């Protein structure tokens, strides 16, 4: 599979080369074989109509004596045999296309998911997991359905009208031309509906649907707030707006198709309105006798066969839309695969120590936008605890996220132990750093495996030592199966503070020399806050620590405090030094003290 992935990745610079056949690999020939078999099946499926016409012809030409019974049996069995043979061939076609479709969908998922593991963590901060799941899972499923069912049906639908047209022109060129006129008009209006603009319409449809789905998830999450404050959907303006945008798109798109759709329907379904009067006219011009009977029989033949063309053209219309949808799904998956991983060094270097140096760093999330960080320089000695404080949007989280290389800096460098993080390689860098974020996530797995994710080879005793160090014993004790309890099933859920303690146990087990902490106690209840603080003290023993602080009470004992403002380091020093400077930090401390002393109603 890795060879297949590399083969696909080498073709990505030329976007025109990557198609569903690329993901199908050697199984693409099965897709072609399935389409050919489907076309053959479609042609053979016309034989029963021909047999039916032969029976009618025998009955008419041999009236009143009656047709030869042997010939009637012959054509009857011919109709049955051709129907069975057509179904058998179609079954073989579906077997081929299903095998190819399953392999194609598997390859699409595997390549995309494997590529996601190589992308920097920063990519996932801007792209929701729900959106990625929908693109990969639903996209692969959509292409699987298209390849397995709709593509062979489309092949049959394209072959059938061609075969029927040949028959129509061979039997009686006059009836053939008359039948061809409304079908040609229908094909013209069909091309107008399914032309080059369909791809853009499908892209807009998927975008509108995606936005509405994302906003729906946020709305569902906010239902407790809606019910508490007796709000309506209109209070969630973004969700309401996304629904309105989707509605507007659907209505406008439908209205844009009403004229060509009506013209197509009238043209295709109007074949009989042209064919029958023309047939009666031609029959009337024929002399009474064999020519008259032959003309009427030819008319019957065309009445039997032209509905097949109508049905097939309708199928072409619907499968053409599915073709556009499958191509759009493929393009969305390719957009993920085209995301470039951060470059890895040919020979990774190891840091000499755990001193962190940030040298003249500038960074922007949008390369054409305003810098989130602007010429930032600072140093955190090995074993020191540094705190980042500042208003929301000042650049604290951005700066910390650059240290483990969630993103690459636009300018300057970040070094650990004298080695640029870009020269360390992802594996070595991840060995050096542990993370504890506010929104710590747990897998739907046992607590043991959740903690052991930091070090998969750790034994149960090592995990238990980390559990005790993180003050998680009470969590484990109340679980039905202890460490083997699966989180997120059968009513087993953890509070936010408990999840933070499990995350701390995970970080303690990893025992990395550098700890990056987004203050874990900001939203914890008092009991959990006390336990988290104890676990935190155990975690940071002898480590180089950088903490994003949301409450100034947690930074008083930090060795160095960096005050961020508009993407720059406005002040730095320890707590006492910054208070004496009477600058931004002193003002923030004063405001914090005022908020702590504030009581409801102004009462002490």
PLM segments and residue spans:
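Transmembrane-helix motif of ABC transporter permease domains
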Residues: 29-48, 61-105, 294-304, 311-312
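ABC-type nucleotide-binding domain
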Residues: 352-604
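Cytoplasmic juxtamembrane "membrane-exit" helices immediately C-terminal to transmembrane segments
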Residues: 95-103, 107, 192-211, 320
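A hydrophobic transmembrane-helix motif
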Residues: 43-54, 85-88, 152-195, 253-301, ...
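Short intracellular "coupling" helices and adjacent cytoplasmic loop segments at the cytosolic face
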Residues: 2-11, 102, 111-140, 215-238, ...
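Cytosolic ends of transmembrane helices, especially the final helix of ABC transmembrane type-1 domains
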Residues: 231, 255-258, 308-336
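Membrane-integrated ABC transporters
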Residues: 1-45, 64-75, 93, 97, ...
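An intracellular "coupling" helix at the cytosolic face of ABC transporter transmembrane type-1 domains
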Residues: 21, 25-29, 121, 138-147, ...
């Amino acid at each position: 599979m890795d060879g297949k992935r590399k083969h696909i990745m080498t073709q990505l610079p030329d976007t025109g080369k990557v198609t569903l056949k690329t993901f199908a690999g050697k199984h693409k020939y099965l897709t072609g074989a399935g389409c050919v078999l489907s076309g053959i099946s479609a042609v053979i499926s016309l034989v029963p109509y021909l047999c039916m016409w032969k029976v009618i012809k025998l009955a008419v030409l041999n009236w009143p004596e009656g047709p030869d019974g042997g010939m009637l049996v012959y054509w009857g069995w011919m109709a049955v045999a051709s129907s069975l043979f057509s179904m058998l061939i179609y079954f073989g076609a579906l077997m081929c296309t299903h095998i190819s479709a399953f392999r194609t969908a598997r390859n699409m998922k595997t390549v995309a998911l494997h590529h996601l593991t190589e992308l920097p963590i920063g990519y996932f901060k801007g792209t929701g997991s729900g959106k990625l799941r929908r693109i990969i899972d639903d996209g692969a499923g959509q292409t699987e359905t298209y390849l397995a069912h709709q593509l062979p049906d489309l092949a049959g639908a394209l072959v059938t009208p061609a075969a029927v047209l040949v028959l129509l022109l061979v039997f009686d060129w006059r009836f053939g031309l008359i039948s061809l006129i409304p079908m040609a008009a229908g094909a013209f209006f069909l091309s107008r509906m399914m032309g080059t603009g369909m791809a853009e319409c499908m892209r807009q449809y998927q975008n509108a649907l995606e936005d509405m789905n994302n906003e729906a998830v946020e709305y569902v999450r906010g239902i407790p707030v809606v019910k508490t404050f007796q709000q309506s959907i209109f209070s969630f303006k973004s969700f309401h707006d996304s629904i309105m945008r989707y509605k507007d798109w659907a209505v406008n798109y439908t209205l844009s198709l009403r004229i060509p759709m009506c013209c197509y329907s009238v043209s295709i379904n109007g074949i009989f309105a042209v064919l029958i009067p023309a047939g009666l006219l031609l029959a009337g011009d024929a002399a009474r006798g064999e020519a008259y009977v032959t003309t009427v029989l030819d008319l019957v033949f065309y009445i039997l066969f032209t509905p097949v063309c109508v049905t097939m053209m309708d199928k072409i219309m619907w499968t053409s839309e599915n073709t556009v949808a499958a191509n759009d799904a493929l393009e969305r998956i390719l957009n993920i695969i085209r995301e470039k991983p951060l470059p890895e060094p040919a020979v990774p270097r190891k840091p000499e120590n755990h001193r962190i140096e940030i040298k003249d760093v500038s960074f922007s999330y949008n390369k054409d936008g305003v810098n989130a960080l602007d010429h930032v320089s600072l140093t955190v000695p090995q074993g020191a605890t540094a705190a980042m404080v500042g208003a929301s949007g000042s650049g604290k989280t951005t700066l910390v996220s650059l240290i483990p290389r969630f993103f690459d800096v636009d300018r300057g460098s970040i070094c650990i132990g004298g080695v640029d993080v870009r020269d360390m390689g992802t594996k070595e860098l991840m060995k050096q750093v542990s993370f504890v974020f506010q929104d710590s996530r747990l897998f739907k797995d046992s607590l043991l495996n959740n903690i052991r994710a930091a070090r998969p080879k750790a034994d149960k005793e090592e995990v238990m030592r980390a559990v005790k160090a993180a003050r998680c014993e009470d969590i484990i004790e109340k679980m039905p199966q202890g460490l083997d309890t699966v989180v997120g099933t059968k009513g087993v859920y953890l509070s936010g503070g408990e999840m933070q303690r499990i995350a701390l146990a995970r970080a303690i087990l990893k025992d990395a020399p550098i700890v990056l902490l987004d203050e874990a106690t900001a939203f914890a209840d008092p009991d959990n806050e006390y336990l988290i603080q104890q676990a935190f003290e155990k975690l940071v023993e002898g480590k180089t620590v950088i903490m994003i602080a949301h409450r100034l009470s947690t930074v008083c004992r930090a060795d160095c405090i960096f005050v961020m403002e508009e993407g720059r380091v406005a002040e730095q020093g320890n707590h006492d030094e910054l208070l004496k400077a009477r600058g931004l930090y002193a003002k923030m401390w004063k405001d914090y003290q005022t908020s702590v002393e504030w009581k409801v109603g102004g009462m002490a």
